[in-house]
């Protein structure tokens, strides 16, 4: 079971274009990978975080119901958060390590600033449609 | 020698004790001014402080006038008739001339009487002085009489050589109690005037310090007023980060005006698309600059930004998360932009829609932040108040994140507009937006500078207007003239 998940995870990693990250995949990263692919829109959040509340509100306002993982309530939350910070640091986000982090269709979109920017430049809606989160 | 010193010391003590009792007596019936009026001319009608200066001046003038005085006293001024001067001239006669130079004006008299005391045993010397003084005083008396002084001053002069009790006894002359009393009074008057001078100088000094403090305050207020650019009253406790931002924003506004006129002339001159593109790109870079400045300011003073103290009042009316609402830009544009293709219109409406959704999301987040701040502060502290405050502070620090995201949203909206529109349309669009905000700022200063009567008559506005704003409005009102 463990072996199966791992091989599946690393496969998905390389297919997602994470490249080198997949090679040094640790448990945190693997957990992110598996959680992110479970739903069309996945948000890694902290239950008390107001910006996380904002991003959840954004998707709900667009008619999307995202899968939300509150890391402060999650048994492996610490691991996942550390892995997310590393992931965002690599993706060149302006605010590395800041939650929320959004995955659409199993692909990393980024933190709040990336989500907002892609919504304004009109790339978010097609992404959501492709992932099957939006029909209209 | 020891005796001399003893007598000196006791004399000093005596002199130090004497003034205070005498000063009170003198202050009550103003004998010193009486002396001046009596001995001098009627022109010595000065106030208390000026009197001190006059006396001081007299002393200096006396020292200056010494050589001619000794040489014959032809140039003696009427003021030298002041009864205390004979003692001084006595002291500064040729044998003592070297000492007289070092004798300062302030402690002169106190030292002086001590020295006179020490000279006392040299009776031949002092008697010689008396002899020398005698004609000199007569001279002075004569000169004073010629200058139209009252005759009383002349009668005063002759007994002066016998001013010292001990001198009088050594020289075997009878001492005149009345003269002694007058001399003592003179000495005390001189001392009193010195004290007054000291007080006056101290008063001047403190006034000077006060003045320089006021000047500094004025300078500060003026520079802050400059930073604010008339955008509002400078806060009494403005932080340095906020002040720097206000200054930078003032500069940015100047740049903004420059960019606006550049775009305007560019559009009017029918520049080529490439030239116009340079101007539009320059404007977008300038627009990005304000977000960089705000990011720095939000780190320094998040509250200054979020309540928009740096904006003009009318701009503040539309404030949303430390700036304009991105969707407002499109509201401004829609009525003003023409010749848009169907695709462009679709793009703009879609932009308006997504910016509204993003605004709504951020507003929800900020609402949640406020709610959690309320919950944190309203709850009675579980462990101690400091921990509660630490939690609240942590929440406030999240405000910075919201300002950053809102600015990101504004910035992205402007960039998206640029992508949707052609260069010429974009130039027109930014001109419309720039002119709109220019008018909004002009409206603010008009509102602030509306006549005071309106403020006074309109009771409701009076209630909502703070004193500062009234002051501000009157200031602007005057500056307009």
UniProtKB/Swiss-Prot annotation, chain A:
The UniProt similarity line reads: Belongs to the glutaredoxin family. CC-type subfamily.
State what changing residue 49 to S does. Alters the function during petal development
Q: What is the documented disruption phenotype for this protein?
A: Plants show a reduced number of petal primordia and abnormalities during further petal development. Defection in sporogenous cell formation in adaxial anther lobes when associated with the disruption of GRXC8/ROXY2 leading to fertility defects.
- The name on file for this protein is Glutaredoxin-C7
Q: What does this protein do?
A: Has a glutathione-disulfide oxidoreductase activity in the presence of NADPH and glutathione reductase. Reduces low molecular weight disulfides and proteins. Involved in flower development as a regulator of petal primorida initiation and further petal morphogenesis. May mediate post-translational modifications of target proteins required for normal petal organ initiation and morphogenesis. ROXY1/TGA protein interactions can occur in vivo and support their biological relevance in petal development. May be involved in the regulation of the floral regulator class C gene AG (AGAMOUS).
State if Electron transport is listed as a keyword.
yes
Q: Which UniProt keywords apply?
A: Cytoplasm, Disulfide bond, Electron transport, Nucleus, Redox-active center, Transport
Q: Which PANTHER family does the entry mention?
A: GLUTAREDOXIN
Domain (Glutaredoxin): residue spans on this chain = 29-135
**Per its UniProt record, what CDD domains does this chain match?**
GRX_GRXh_1_2_like (cd03419)
**In what tissue types does this protein appear?**
Highly expressed in inflorescences, roots, and siliques. Expressed at lower levels in mature flowers.
List, in alphabetical order, the GO biological process terms annotated in this UniProt record: negative regulation of DNA-templated transcription; negative regulation of transcription by RNA polymerase II; petal development; petal formation; stamen morphogenesis
GO cellular component entries: cytoplasm; nucleus
UniProt-reported outcome of changing residue 90 to S: No effect on the function during petal development
Phenotype for residue 110 to A? Affects glutathione binding
Record organism: Arabidopsis thaliana
Cited NCBIfam families: GlrX-like_plant (TIGR02189)
InterPro entries cross-referenced by the UniProt entry: GlrX-like_pln_2, Glutaredoxin, Thioredoxin-like_sf
UniProt main location, coarse = cytoplasm
Q: Where in the cell is it found?
A: Cytoplasm; Nucleus
* Disulfide cysteine pairs (residue numbers): 49-52
What does the annotation say about its assembly with partners?
Interacts with TGA2, TGA3, TGA7 and PAN. Interacts with TGA9 and TGA10 in the nucleus.
Kindly state the positions of the motif Responsive for interaction with TGA factors in this protein.
Answer: 133-136
UniProtKB/Swiss-Prot annotation, chain B:
UniProt keyword list: Activator, DNA-binding, Nucleus, Transcription, Transcription regulation
Q: Phenotype when inactivated? A: In the double mutant tga9 tga10, reduced male fertility due to defects in male gametogenesis, with early steps in anther development blocked in adaxial lobes and later steps affected in abaxial lobes. Microspore development in abaxial anther lobes leads to the production of inviable pollen grains contained within nondehiscent anthers. In addition, multiple defects in the anther dehiscence program are observed, including abnormal stability and lignification of the middle layer and defects in septum and stomium function. Reduced SPL levels in anthers.
| Domain of life from the UniProt record | Eukaryota
Q: Where in the cell is it found?
A: Nucleus
Which region ranges are annotated with the description Leucine-zipper? Answer: 204-218
Q: Where is the DOG1 domain?
A: 242-450
Q: Which residues form a coiled coil?
A: none
One GO molecular-function entry: DNA-binding transcription factor activity
Q: Where is this region: Disordered?
A: 91-181
Biased segments, Polar residues type: 110-126
- Its predominant location is nucleus
Q: In which tissues is it expressed?
A: Mostly expressed in stems, inflorescence apex and flowers, and, to a lower extent, in seedlings, leaves and siliques.
> Which GO biological process categories is it annotated with?
anther development; DNA-templated transcription; hydrogen peroxide mediated signaling pathway; response to molecule of bacterial origin
Q: Which GO terms describe its cellular component?
A: nucleus
Span list, region Basic motif: 178-198
Q: Where is this motif: Nuclear localization signal?
A: 165-172
What upregulates or represses it? Induced by flg22 in leaves.
Please list the residue ranges that the record marks as compositionally biased, kind Low complexity. 97-109, 143-155
Task: Please explain the role this protein plays, according to its UniProt record.
Answer: Together with TGA10, basic leucine-zipper transcription factor required for anther development, probably via the activation of SPL expression in anthers and via the regulation of genes with functions in early and middle tapetal development. Required for signaling responses to pathogen-associated molecular patterns (PAMPs) such as flg22 that involves chloroplastic reactive oxygen species (ROS) production and subsequent expression of H(2)O(2)-responsive genes.
State the family it belongs to: Belongs to the bZIP family.
Q: Could you identify this protein by its name?
A: Transcription factor TGA9
Q: Which organism is it from?
A: Arabidopsis thaliana
């Amino acid at each position: 079971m463990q072996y199966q998940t791992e091989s599946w995870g690393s496969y998905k990693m390389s297919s997602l274009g994470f490249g080198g990250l997949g090679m040094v995949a640790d448990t945190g990263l693997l957990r992110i990978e598996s959680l992110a692919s479970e739903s069309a829109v996945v948000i890694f959040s902290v239950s008390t975080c107001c910006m996380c509340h904002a991003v959840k509100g954004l998707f709900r306002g667009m008619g999307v119901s995202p899968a939300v993982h509150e890391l402060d309530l999650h048994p492996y939350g610490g691991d996942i958060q550390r892995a997310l910070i590393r992931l965002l640091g690599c993706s060149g986000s302006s605010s590395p390590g800041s939650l929320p982090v959004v995955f659409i269709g199993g692909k990393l979109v980024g933190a709040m600033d990336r989500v907002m920017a892609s919504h304004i430049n009109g790339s978010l809606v097609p992404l959501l449609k492709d992932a099957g989160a939006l029909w209209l | 020698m020891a005796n001399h010193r003893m007598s000196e010391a006791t004399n000093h003590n005596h002199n130090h004790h004497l003034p205070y009792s005498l000063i009170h007596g003198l202050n009550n019936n103003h004998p010193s001014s009486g002396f001046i009026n009596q001995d001098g001319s009627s022109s010595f009608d000065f106030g208390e402080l000026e009197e001190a200066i006059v006396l001081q001046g007299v002393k200096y003038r006396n020292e200056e006038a010494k050589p001619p005085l000794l040489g014959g006293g032809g140039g003696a001024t009427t003021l030298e008739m002041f009864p205390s001067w004979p003692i001084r001239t006595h002291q500064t006669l040729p044998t003592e001339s070297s000492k007289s130079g070092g004798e300062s004006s302030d402690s002169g008299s106190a030292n002086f009487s001590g020295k006179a005391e020490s000279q006392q045993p040299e009776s031949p010397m002092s008697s010689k002085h008396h002899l020398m003084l005698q004609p000199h005083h007569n001279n002075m008396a004569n000169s004073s009489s010629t200058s139209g002084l009252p005759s009383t001053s002349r009668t005063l002069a002759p007994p002066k050589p016998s001013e010292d009790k001990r001198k009088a006894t050594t020289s075997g002359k009878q001492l005149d109690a009345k003269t002694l009393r007058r001399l003592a009074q003179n000495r005390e008057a001189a001392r009193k005037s010195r004290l007054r001078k000291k007080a006056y100088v101290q008063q001047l000094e403190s006034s000077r310090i006060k003045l320089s403090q006021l000047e500094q305050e004025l300078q500060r207020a003026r520079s802050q007023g400059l930073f604010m650019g008339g955008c509002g009253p400078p806060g009494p406790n403005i932080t340095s980060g906020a002040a720097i931002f206000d200054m930078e924003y003032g500069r940015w506004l100047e740049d903004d005006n420059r960019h606006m006129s550049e775009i305007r002339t560019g559009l009017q001159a029918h520049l080529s698309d490439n030239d116009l593109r340079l101007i539009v790109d320059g404007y977008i870079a300038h627009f990005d600059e304000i977000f960089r400045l705000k990011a720095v300011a939000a780190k320094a003073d998040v509250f200054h930004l979020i309540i928009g103290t740096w904006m003009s009042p009318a701009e503040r009316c539309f404030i949303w998360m430390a700036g304009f609402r991105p969707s407002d830009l499109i509201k401004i544009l829609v009525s003003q932009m023409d010749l848009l293709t169907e695709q462009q219109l679709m793009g703009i409406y879609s932009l308006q829609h997504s910016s509204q959704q993003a605004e709504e999301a951020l507003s929800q987040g900020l609402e949640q932040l406020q709610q959690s701040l309320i919950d944190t502060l309203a709850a009675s502290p579980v462990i101690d108040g400091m921990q509660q405050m630490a939690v609240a502070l942590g929440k406030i620090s999240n405000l910075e994140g919201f300002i950053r995201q809102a600015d990101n949203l504004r910035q992205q909206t402007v960039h998206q507009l640029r992508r949707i529109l052609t260069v010429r349309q974009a130039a027109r669009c930014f001109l419309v937006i720039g002119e709109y905000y220019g008018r909004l700022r002009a409206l603010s200063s008009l509102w602030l500078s509306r006549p005071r009567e309106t403020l006074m008559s309109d009771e409701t506005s009076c209630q909502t207007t703070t004193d500062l704003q009234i002051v501000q409005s009157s200031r602007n009102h005057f500056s307009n003239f």
